């Protein structure tokens, strides 16, 4: 907050802690036609906003999502990360045709403000609020995906570190993807909430 105050940048404080409440606070205070998520732990390329807006301005498009990379470190080599990202990107691409809501990630998500307000952002779940929003936005138009480097963000390891090593993280996600491979070829309009994902079950 001190940095925003010193630079004169408008900001809003959300006292309720969760990604859903933070996203909803931003949406409720948005004043533009398009709402572009920007995460504080993520680096974005110079023309990220322009690239996302250009995609949003195409006829019939109500939301767009792009891809992201990780910075190599002593525990994650450049080659292993590239292989991991390639496999993940291919899966997200194939999945995006029939079930784009499963390929959306909040750190690289942008959408029409008016439609998003009609759908709303869920605050009763621990994860998946962005995908849930995308699911609701589908009835208003297309969820597009930007594959350009100009829209590729760089972020921390977050959830992939939760499963231990990069290899183990890949195994966990590969098994999950294989179990749901049939979903790549069919649309889905309703998803059942898992009990462990509900904040107040």
Predicted regions and their residues:
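Acidic donor-binding loop at a coil-to-helix junction in glycosyltransferase catalytic cores
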Residues: 126-133
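Glycine-rich, basic loop-to-helix element that forms the pyrophosphate-binding segment
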Residues: 3, 14-30
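Short aromatic/hydrophobic "clamp" motif used to bind/position activated sugar donors
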Residues: 35
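Active-site donor/metal-binding and catalytic loop motifs
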Residues: 147-164
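Conserved nucleotide-sugar donor-binding
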Residues: 31-32, 105-119
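Short, flexible, basic/aromatic active-site loop/helix in glycosyltransferases
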Residues: 66-72, 80-102
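Conserved donor NDP-sugar-binding/catalytic core segment of glycosyltransferases
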Residues: 47-78
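Acidic helix N-cap motif at the loop->helix transition within catalytic regions
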Residues: 1-6, 47
């Amino acid at each position: 907050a001190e940095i925003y105050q010193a630079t004169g940048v408008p900001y809003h404080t959300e006292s309720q802690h969760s990604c859903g409440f933070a996203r909803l606070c931003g949406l409720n205070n948005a004043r533009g036609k398009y709402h572009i998520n920007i995460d504080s732990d993520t680096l974005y390329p110079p023309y990220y906003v322009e690239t996302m807006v250009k995609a949003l301005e195409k006829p019939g498009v109500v939301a767009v999502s792009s891809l992201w990379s990780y910075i190599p470190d002593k525990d994650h080599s450049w080659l292993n990360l590239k292989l991991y990202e390639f496999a993940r990107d291919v899966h997200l691409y194939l999945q995006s045709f029939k079930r784009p809501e499963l390929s959306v990630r909040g750190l690289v998500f942008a959408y029409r403000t008016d439609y998003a307000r009609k759908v709303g952002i869920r605050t009763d779940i621990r994860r998946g609020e962005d995908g849930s929003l995308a699911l609701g936005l589908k009835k208003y138009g297309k969820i597009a995906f930007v594959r350009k480097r100009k829209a590729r963000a760089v972020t921390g390891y977050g959830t992939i570190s939760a499963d231990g090593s990069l290899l183990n993280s890949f195994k966990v996600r590969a098994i999950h993807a294989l179990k749901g491979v049939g979903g790549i070829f069919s649309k889905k309009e309703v998803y059942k909430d898992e009990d462990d994902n509900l904040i107040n079950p």
